[in-house]
Amino acid sequence: MSLIDWFAARRKDQFVGKVSQDTDEGDGLWVKCSECSQVAYRKDLISNFNVCSNCGHHNRINSDERINIIADKNSFKEFDSSLSPTDPLGFKDRRSYADRIKESQAGTGLRDGVITGFCSVNSMPLALAVMDFRFMGGSMGSVVGEKITRIIERATIENYPILIVCASGGARMQEGMLSLMQMAKISGALKKHKEKNLLYMPLLTHPTTGGVTASFAMLGDLILAEPKALIGFAGRRVIEQTLREKLPDNFQTAEYLLEHGFVDVIVKRKDLKTTLTKILKIHGVKELAEANI
């Protein structure tokens, strides 16, 4: 490589974000789509809800960005923001669980992998829980389970509909049984919510897997999903080795689940708030004064 080529490559790196396929995050003015490799101006991508304008790929977004898309401006009131995980088992693999918690908290600014609260959607009340995949893969530990259970219980008392935005690798193995029991605890809270004939909707985003899929992600009155989201319990390789069969290429995608009746509707990110508004109105949710949220 000549000196001129070296400077040209160095200059290009300053402007083109190095996008990871796992995070879809870059550090430059331009971002390459991990699906179609189209290069887009970062500000244009953000203004399009972090969806590729060329292929429609829905890049991962964080919990704050989700809330901004769903909730009316300044309407979100967060609950239980002080809850933080501990290390009850003193778990350690290559690194200690305590160190992993600290690293995720420092990297995301979150205490754990979910944000919960009340908000309004076009002036209609909604209890909202948003999982954040950046925090240890969105895994469900005792704090995530407790916060989701509490927001369901609050919604039941206030007669509010619920939306849970799912993005998770499943139960958090570092907490053992304390993690697994959250599946039953959340499901029990949802049953009480359902007994009052209140609306519950999960939104399945990429990826929604493991214990989250096996519990509250599939208990909705209406199950929504983002396009091409990976949704499943066990991984493709595990299933193929168990069944000794080759699975379809689109297996465990939102489109495959819609075709087979596990998902009710696939919603593009730009249409989410409009779709939620229609669903809430159809189910008779009344507008609520901002002061009452």
Curated annotation (Swiss-Prot):
One of its GO terms (cellular component) is acetyl-CoA carboxylase complex. Pathway: Lipid metabolism; malonyl-CoA biosynthesis; malonyl-CoA from acetyl-CoA: step 1/1. It comes from the Bacteria. It is found in: Cytoplasm. Its cofactor is Zn(2+). The keyword Zinc-finger applies. GO terms for molecular function: acetyl-CoA carboxylase activity; ATP binding; carboxyl- or carbamoyltransferase activity; zinc ion binding. Zn(2+) binds at C33, C36, C52, C55. Coiled coil: none annotated. Binds 1 zinc ion per subunit. PANTHER family: ACETYL-COENZYME A CARBOXYLASE CARBOXYL TRANSFERASE SUBUNIT BETA, CHLOROPLASTIC. Acetyl-CoA carboxylase is a heterohexamer composed of biotin carboxyl carrier protein (AccB), biotin carboxylase (AccC) and two subunits each of ACCase subunit alpha (AccA) and ACCase subunit beta (AccD). This is Acetyl-coenzyme A carboxylase carboxyl transferase subunit beta. It comes from Prochlorococcus marinus (strain MIT 9312).
